[in-house]
């Protein structure tokens, strides 16, 4: 009787049209229900039965209904799924396979099956790569995924590395070597093999790409010669090797090992500036004044050099600090170290006055056993030898930036524009509230930014520095010259690590064109996009492996009385993020661990403080004592508790 009733159809259409709808992102919880967050402002409750149609992170359109004075969102249309390609652990029950995504808020197993070309017989606990193929909001009965790759079995000690690399779709191995002969024989090279070049690196470094030589001019100035390994002498542009290097963009440094951008035979042998071996290089010569300024006599050339010594950071630092457990092999090497120290001091002083110098932060190095277990975490403080190399490399990169700018007008530049113009007023307000008067327009200029940074660096704590960091832009890679506010420099273009950075290889080719007077082509914008994306992925991979190893390392400390000194690095509504200063691990302190009565504690990202009953008890950058409360291995999260 009601079939094909036009009035009923019209009524249904009216109801559909009149039902309010919102678009937002699903936020899952551990309790089965969820929320639809709209524009970060409003959230609507999603009951457990409705949550079965969606997944945490899905962007959806939902209809709104009222139930007992509560607005409820009912998922209707999928706008963008959260999961497409992902990694997870396979569960096998009888002959049925399912996969649990490796994500803190995705705990439900998803039915899955291997794609036809995948021959591996999956077992319980295996790690795999999967692609979502079915979704309830697309009209399917349930979620389903295709298994597209086997990563490793659950017992593999190196799961953190293999799973992380698969998650970010990064290579596991070095590129294969392709027969590579010296291909730029027509390039005229100076013979500088008689000069006392030295390399300074870690003891374990094999890919040495920079060597240094100093000449004392006798008038207080020095002639610094920086020799950089020349892989473009072997890697022809657009060759198979070059396209591989372009895709990888960087050597990927992970705890315990690296995955090189170039074949190891090139990076660790043919191009590496090994002691007493003749190598092709690009050379930059520049006079450095007694005050530490770079003179205008910057000159680039191609050359042959022969490093006379492979020096180690700690050995050189010990010797310069008066600890004589190690001695340079002869007086010529000793003289080079002494002259390099003088250049370092002069350049550092000049940069402190005319540019910006980063505050020294320690590096943390995992000491691993044969099965990937963390034996120890070594805190490596930056010492004088590290600073010598850093000052020489910064000088070399400034020289390249200026030479490429003046001769070609383009290159691969590292650009950082300081404060975001849209946020600079907020930055000025925060500064003013903390007793620092700053003109927003002046902060957008390089001199104004440098002046502020020097003022902040002179303050007794880093509270204000960490507060205004969120108003700054990120460093970018550009094909045209631009300032680098973070370094306080007019222009900065790296060319000193061509074995491990593709952008530096591009700059090498441009410098060679400049040296020979040949026509040079401006790099394609796609290269900067690829470099930026690969840098982001490599950093995420390093962080993910680190989180996994920290969780393994700290698990035995959970629930014990062991104390750690920690620095507050971030304050969110839910609590504090802290860095343990002894080992570099990041831990989270939930607000209830700070004060039992939740209504009396306010954690404010806006002010960078934690207040209890209106009184500030913690501020960003404070040092506090903590204990490890819990380590959640499945999410690699470390939960800490302040020591009362």
Swiss-Prot record:
Keywords for this protein: Cytoplasm, Exonuclease, Hydrolase, Nuclease, RNA-binding
Record PROSITE patterns: RIBONUCLEASE_II (PS01175)
Reaction equations catalysed: Exonucleolytic cleavage in the 3'- to 5'-direction to yield nucleoside 5'-phosphates
Pfam (any one): S1
InterPro entries per record: CSD (IPR011129), NA-bd_OB-fold (IPR012340), RNase_B_OB_dom (IPR013223), RNase_II (IPR011804), RNase_II/R (IPR001900), RNase_II/R_CS (IPR022966), RNase_II/RNase_R (IPR004476), RNR_Ribonuclease (IPR050180)
Biological processes annotated in GO: mRNA catabolic process
Enzyme type, top EC level: hydrolase
Coiled coil location: none
Primary localization class, coarse: cytoplasm
GO molecular function terms noted in the UniProt entry: exoribonuclease II activity; RNA binding
Domain spans labelled S1 motif: 561-643
GO cellular component, one term: cytosol
Gene3D superfamilies: 2.40.50.640, Nucleic acid-binding proteins
SMART domains: CSP, RNB
RNB domain: residues covered: 189-516
EC number: 3.1.13.1
Protein's cellular compartments: Cytoplasm
Family: Belongs to the RNR ribonuclease family. RNase II subfamily.
NCBIfam families: 3_prime_RNase (TIGR00358), PRK05054.1 (NF003455), RNase_B (TIGR02062)
Main function: Involved in mRNA degradation. Hydrolyzes single-stranded polyribonucleotides processively in the 3' to 5' direction.
Protein name: Exoribonuclease 2
């Amino acid at each position: 009787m009601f079939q094909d009733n036009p009035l009923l159809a019209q009524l249904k259409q009216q109801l559909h049209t009149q039902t309010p709808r919102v678009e937002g992102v699903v936020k899952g919880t551990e309790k089965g229900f969820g929320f639809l967050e709209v524009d970060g402002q409003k959230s609507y409750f999603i009951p457990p039965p409705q949550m079965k149609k969606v997944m945490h992170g899905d962007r959806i359109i939902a209809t709104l209904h009222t139930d007992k004075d509560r607005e409820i969102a009912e998922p209707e249309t999928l706008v963008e799924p959260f999961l497409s390609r992902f990694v997870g652990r396979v569960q096998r029950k009888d002959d049925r396979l399912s996969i649990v995504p490796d994500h803190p808020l995705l705990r439900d197993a998803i039915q899955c099956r291997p794609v036809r070309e995948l021959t591996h017989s999956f077992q319980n606990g295996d790690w795999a790569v999967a692609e979502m193929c079915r979704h309830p909001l697309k009209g399917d009965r349930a979620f389903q995924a295709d298994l597209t790759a086997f990563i490793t079995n659950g017992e593999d000690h190196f799961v953190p590395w293999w799973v992380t690399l698969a998650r970010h779709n990064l290579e596991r191995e070095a590129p294969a070597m392709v027969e590579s002969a010296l291909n730029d024989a027509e390039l005229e090279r100076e013979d500088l093999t008689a000069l006392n070049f030295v390399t300074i690196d870690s003891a374990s470094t094999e890919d040495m790409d920079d060597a240094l030589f100093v000449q004392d001019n006798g008038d207080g100035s020095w002639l610094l010669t920086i020799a950089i390994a020349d892989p473009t002498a072997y890697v022809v542009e657009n060759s198979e090797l070059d396209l591989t290097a372009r895709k990888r963009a960087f050597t990927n440094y992970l705890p315990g090992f690296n995955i090189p951008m170039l074949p190891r035979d090139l990076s660790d042998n043919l191009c590496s500036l090994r002691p007493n071996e003749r190598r092709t290089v690009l050379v930059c010569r520049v006079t450095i004044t007694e005050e530490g300024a770079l003179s205008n006599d910057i000159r680039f050339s191609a050359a042959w050099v022969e490093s006379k010594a492979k020096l180690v950071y700690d050995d050189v630092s010990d010797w310069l600090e008066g600890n004589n457990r190690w001695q340079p092999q002869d007086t010529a090497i000793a003289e080079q170290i002494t002259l390099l120290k003088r250049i370092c001091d002069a350049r550092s002083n000049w940069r402190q006055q005319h540019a910006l110098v980063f505050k020294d932060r320690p590096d943390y190095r995992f000491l691993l056993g044969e099965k990937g277990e963390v034996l120890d975490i070594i805190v490596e403080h930056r010492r004088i030898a590290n600073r010598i190399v850093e000052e020489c490399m910064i000088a070399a990169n400034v020289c390249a930036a200026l030479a490429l700018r003046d001769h070609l007008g383009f290159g691969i530049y590292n650009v950082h524009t300081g404060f975001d113009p849209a946020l600079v007023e907020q930055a000025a307000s925060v500064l003013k509230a903390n007793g620092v008067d700053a003109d927003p327009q002046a902060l957008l200029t390089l001199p104004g930014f440098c002046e502020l940074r020097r003022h902040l660096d002179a303050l007794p704590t880093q509270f204000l520095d960490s507060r205004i960091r969120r108003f700054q832009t990120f460093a970018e890679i550009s094909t045209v010259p631009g300032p680098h506010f973070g370094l306080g420099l007019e222009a900065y273009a790296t060319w000193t690590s061509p074995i491990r950075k593709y952008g530096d290889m591009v700059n090498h080719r441009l410098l060679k064109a400049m040296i020979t007077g040949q026509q040079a082509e401006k790099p394609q914008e796609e290269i900067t996009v690829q470099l930026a994306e690969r840098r982001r992925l490599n950093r995420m991979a390093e962080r993910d492996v680190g989180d996994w190893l920290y969780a393994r390392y700290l698990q035995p400390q959970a629930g014990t009385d062991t104390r750690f000194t920690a620095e507050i690095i971030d304050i969110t509504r839910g609590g504090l993020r802290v860095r343990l200063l002894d080992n570099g691990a990041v831990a989270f302190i939930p607000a209830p661990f700070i004060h039992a009565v939740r209504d009396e504690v306010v954690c404010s990202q806006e002010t960078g403080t934690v207040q209890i009953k209106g009184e500030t008890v913690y501020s960003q950058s404070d040092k506090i004592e903590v204990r490890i409360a819990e380590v959640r291995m499945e999410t690699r999260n470390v939960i800490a508790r302040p020591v009362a």
